[in-house]
């Protein structure tokens, strides 16, 4: 708007008549006529058309005749609004950035897949309470390939009498005997030549400071394998083999000493023909009296009996002396076992009892060459470790081999080994920390019907259902009905025999069989009440399972006990850690047998943990 257009009508007339020009407009003039100024402003660009809007573009001259070339873009939205398949004559080149991005994505996917395989993609709840030391699957595969060629005990460098003891005493009822994975791994590693007494005496004595630093200067091994795979035999055979070799070395040394002694006596007798030799006042004491060559430490008296029984069986053929002592024995029996004049080679005991005996008789630990700590995860925890370490220190001067044995490697045991035994060799199996796939795990929600939160009722119902098929079959058999019980607990050989009667057509019956069947039929219908029994009706049915045996135990029975006959394990409470899961479910499915575990869960328990353990068992994965 011009300044003239913003003046009033009177001033404009004066300008026309007298030629008078008004002064420069003031700011208030524009404020006063702001509404008029708004109308005179320049229109925005979005409201103005281009002067070339009516002109046609060269790019769209032939738009009706020819369609624009399609654009192929490799982006998330490149496949939208397509009217035809993108089939170019040659592959579309990709940029360097896109190639880099795709290769990095592929590497990430491969890495994620490897991590998923190693750690377990479904271990979300278990990762919150990791209790076991992990073992890479690459190492598991290497061990599996290494032991694949070992199929017999004859491939081990064992003495003939030791090998014969395995076939005759360890597995007397089996026809085909082959070593388990832990035996294939451990026996070759533990076998070593014996060290003679002369070689021990030739060792140079070290200063006291160096002796303290090298207190545990001996071979150290850790045997770790799943439950029920023969770990006891894996460390017993090398020890027995070493004892027999040491006896042979000592026997040769003794013969040489006796020959030299006899030669000296002969020369002396020639010089003094008329002197009489004084008789010995007492017979020399046996060198093995209360001085065992090997000691096996176990946490409970039940394990003392179990390991001692296996050692006693092997001694019938291998010819060595073993003894067991525990708190359940009388003092007289303990004394007779330790101070037997025939000597002792292997001693099986608990740490408490052996420590108390060593305080009064420290000489008992002066000849130990092999020390085995069975169930090491228990004996090296806070409750047992002071006693176990004291026995280690007292046997260290003569010790040549320390063997730790366990079904699991908890993180606590892993830290102890890294701190105390950094040079320990770990002998593990490919399926360590994995519950065998032949063991099935069932879950019973006690909050649902029919138990409705009553765990005792749910447990009783499960036990009754386990033996119900056999009980019904026995009842029908008593009434003259040919019946056979078939369930999951039926042995495989018996299953084949039972199913053969129902899957194969029998030949026609003989005339004698027809007569017997007709006679039984007449006797059946002649009885007015065929199913009546001699029991009083007012007493009611006797609900008992004669062929079902139940053992109710605490966590004490989940460590090391070789419960071969157990087929079912009921976990009344959900285990707190995966370690307890492995040990408790390990009471069944031992030595290749089938088994079943049943967990009772309620609303207070971690159902997600039980679910992940069950899925890991189904896949054959190791727990964490």
Swiss-Prot record:
Compositional bias ranges of the Basic and acidic residues kind: 86-119
One Pfam family cited in the UniProt record for this chain: Helicase_C
UniProt-annotated binding residues for ATP: 225-232
SMART domains found in the cross-reference section: DEXDc (SM00487), HELICc (SM00490)
Transit peptide feature, positions: 1-43
GO molecular function annotations of the record: ATP binding; ATP hydrolysis activity; RNA binding; RNA helicase activity
Motif DEAD box per record, residues: 374-377
Keyword Kinase: no
Keywords: ATP-binding, Helicase, Hydrolase, Mitochondrion, Nucleotide-binding, RNA-binding, Transit peptide
Reactions the enzyme catalyzes: ATP + H2O = ADP + phosphate + H(+)
EC number: 3.6.4.13
Region of interest: Disordered: 41-120
Short sequence motif Q motif: positions: 151-184
Domain comment, as recorded: The Q motif is unique to and characteristic of the DEAD box family of RNA helicases and controls ATP binding and hydrolysis.
Protein name per its UniProtKB record: ATP-dependent RNA helicase MRH4, mitochondrial
């Amino acid at each position: 708007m011009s300044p003239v257009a913003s003046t009033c009508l009177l001033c404009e007339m004066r300008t026309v008549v007298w030629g008078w020009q008004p002064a420069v407009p003031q700011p208030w003039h524009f404020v006063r006529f702001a509404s008029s100024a708004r109308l005179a402003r320049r229109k925005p660009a979005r409201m103005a058309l281009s002067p070339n809007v009516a002109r046609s573009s060269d790019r769209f001259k032939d738009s009706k005749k020819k369609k624009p070339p399609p654009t192929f873009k490799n982006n998330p939205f490149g496949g939208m609004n397509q009217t035809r398949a993108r089939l170019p004559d040659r592959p579309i080149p990709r940029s360097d950035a896109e190639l880099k991005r795709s290769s990095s994505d592929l590497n990430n996917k491969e890495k994620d897949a490897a991590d998923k395989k190693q750690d377990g993609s479904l271990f979300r709840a278990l990762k919150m309470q990791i209790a076991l030391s992990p073992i890479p699957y690459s190492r598991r595969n290497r061990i599996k390939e290494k032991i694949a060629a070992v199929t017999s005990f004859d491939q081990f460098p064992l003495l003939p009498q030791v090998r014969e003891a395995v076939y005759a005493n360890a597995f007397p009822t089996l026809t085909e005997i082959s070593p388990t994975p832990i035996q294939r791994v451990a026996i070759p590693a533990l076998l070593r030549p014996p060290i003679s007494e002369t070689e021990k005496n030739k060792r140079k004595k070290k200063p006291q400071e160096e002796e303290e630093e090298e207190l545990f200067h001996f071979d150290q091994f850790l045997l770790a394998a799943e439950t029920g795979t023969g770990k006891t035999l894996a460390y017993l055979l090398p020890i027995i083999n070493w004892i027999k070799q040491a006896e042979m070395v000592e026997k040769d040394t003794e013969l040489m000493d006796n020959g030299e002694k006899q030669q000296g006596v002969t020369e002396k007798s020639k010089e003094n023909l008329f002197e009489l030799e004084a008789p010995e006042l007492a017979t020399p004491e046996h060198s093995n009296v209360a001085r065992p060559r090997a000691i096996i430490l176990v946490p409970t008296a039940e394990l003392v009996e179990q390991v001692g029984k296996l050692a006693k069986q092997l001694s019938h053929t291998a010819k060595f002396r073993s003894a067991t002592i525990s708190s359940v024995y009388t003092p007289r029996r303990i004394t007779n076992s330790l101070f037997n004049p025939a000597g002792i080679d292997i001693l099986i005991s608990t740490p408490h009892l052996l420590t108390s005996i060593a305080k009064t008789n420290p000489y008992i630990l002066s000849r130990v060459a092999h020390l085995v700590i069975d169930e090491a995860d228990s004996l090296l925890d806070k409750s047992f470790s002071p006693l176990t370490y004291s026995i280690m220190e007292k046997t260290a001067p003569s010790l040549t081999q320390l063997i730790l044995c366990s079904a699991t490697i908890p993180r606590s045991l892993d830290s102890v080994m890294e701190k105390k035994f950094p040079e320990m060799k770990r002998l593990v199996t490919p399926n360590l920390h994995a519950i065998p796939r032949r063991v099935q795990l069932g879950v019973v929600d006690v909050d649902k019907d029919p138990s409705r939160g009553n765990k005792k009722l749910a447990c009783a119902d499960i036990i009754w259902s386990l033996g119900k098929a056999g009980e019904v079959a026995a009842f029908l058999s008593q009434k003259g009905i040919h019946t056979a019980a078939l369930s999951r607990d039926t042995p495989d050989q018996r299953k084949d025999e039972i199913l053969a009667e129902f899957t194969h057509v029998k030949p026609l019956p003989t005339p004698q069989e027809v007569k017997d069947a007709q006679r039984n039929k007449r006797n059946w219908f002649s009885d007015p009440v065929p199913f009546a029994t001699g029991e009083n009706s007012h007493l009611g049915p006797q609900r008992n399972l004669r062929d079902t045996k139940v053992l109710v135990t605490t966590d004490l029975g989940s460590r090391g006990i070789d419960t071969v006959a157990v087929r079912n394990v009921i976990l009344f409470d959900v285990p707190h850690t995966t370690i307890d899961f492995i040990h408790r479910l390990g009471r069944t499915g031992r030595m290749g047998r089938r088994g079943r575990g049943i967990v009772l869960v309620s609303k207070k328990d971690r159902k997600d943990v039980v679910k992940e353990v069950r899925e890991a068992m189904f896949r054959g994965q190791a727990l964490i």
